[in-house]
Amino acid sequence: MKNILFATSEAVPFIKTGGLADVAGSLPKYFDKRYFDIRVILPKYACMKQEWKDKMNYITHFYMDLGYKNCYVGIMHMEYEGIQFYFIDNEYYFSGPKPYDGGTWDLEKFAFFSKAVLSVLPVIGFRPDIIHCHDWQRSEE
């Protein structure tokens, strides 16, 4: 069994600004579950619809250093269409009215997300053989 983690800044049906969400939210369900354990991780944005946030289960939280900051990292979970989705919670970075703000703020936000993704893996007990980093927001990893 191969373990694959899709790390993305958006995925349907939870949050969508463009085609990235379609790929990251749809592709995982087409892998043969006999051979692949596919999981998806993305930010828990404040601008997500409340109906999705209400279905998430809190797993745990911890604090992680990012430069001079000690940052809260919450881990939420939901199964959707047979796929395990994890959501990184941090109100400081993900409380805006939309997923992307533009400019340098997005660089810091997704640097945090990139480090949080790697820090979450031992906590959730998932050891991916492949981490599929989607789009520029994941390129810091």
What residues fall within each predicted segment?
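Catalytic cores of nucleotide-sugar-dependent glycosyltransferases that transfer UDP/GDP/TDP-activated
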Residues: 1-141
